[in-house]
């Protein structure tokens, strides 16, 4: 399962790069075209999970959240503009139709919250350390490090909570992430 999650994130990052260099007409048909930008006032609902499960994962997954940290970088006349957003992809995220538990939904929401947490970390580090187009290698280093840490924390979250089955650990994670987002 860990390999699958890491692979999905790697594929997502690669596809985001490809999407950014394709023209806008092909973007409309792409599964990444529909997304939800993280907002503290907008929580996920089961209606946001529109993909069909690819296969059965007995006793492992009842839902899957696909989210990303989308990073945009443009440079003109030595000035840089960087945009960073935590995004959730409804057309890639799924749940089994017989699963409508608010508890499982909260577990999936926290995956998206962790994505936002790392988007904020990236925004902060880049704004503090990247001042001009000369800092592109510093920018690349920050992005790589944050993405790696984000992936590690997502995996630790699932491992320690047993995908939400361990309610004591789940509550610890919820409290920790909410404090870090505050």
Question: What are the residue ranges of the model-derived segments?
Answer:
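Active-site recognition of the HExxH zinc-binding catalytic motif
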Residues: 103-115
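Bacterial Sec-dependent N-terminal signal peptides
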Residues: 1-33
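Metalloprotease/metallohydrolase-associated module, dominated by Zn2+-dependent proteases
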Residues: 30-79, 88, 130-182
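Membrane-interfacial alpha-helical segments at the cytosolic side of multi-pass membrane proteins
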Residues: 117-126
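Short alpha-helical functional segments enriched in proximate histidine and acidic residues
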Residues: 112, 125, 153
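Residue-level marker of positions within ordered structural domains that often coincide
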Residues: 25, 91, 155
């Amino acid at each position: 399962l860990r390999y699958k999650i890491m692979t999905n994130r790697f594929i997502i990052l690669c596809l985001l790069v490809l999407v950014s260099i394709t023209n806008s007409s092909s973007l409309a048909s792409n599964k990444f075209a529909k997304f939800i930008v993280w907002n503290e006032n907008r929580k996920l609902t089961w209606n946001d999970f529109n993909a069909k499960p690819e296969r059965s994962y007995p006793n492992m997954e009842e839902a899957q959240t696909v989210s990303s940290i989308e990073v945009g970088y443009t440079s003109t006349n030595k000035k840089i503009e960087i945009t960073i957003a935590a995004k959730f992809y409804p057309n890639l995220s799924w749940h089994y139709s017989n699963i409508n538990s608010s508890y499982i939904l909260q577990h999936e929401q926290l995956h998206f919250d962790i994505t936002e947490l790392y988007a904020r970390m990236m925004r902060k580090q880049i704004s503090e350390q990247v001042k001009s187009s000369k800092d592109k290698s510093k920018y690349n280093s920050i992005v790589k490090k944050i993405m790696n840490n984000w992936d590690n924390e997502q995996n630790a979250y699932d491992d320690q909570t047993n995908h939400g089955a361990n309610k004591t650990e789940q509550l610890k994670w919820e409290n920790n992430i909410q404090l870090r987002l505050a």
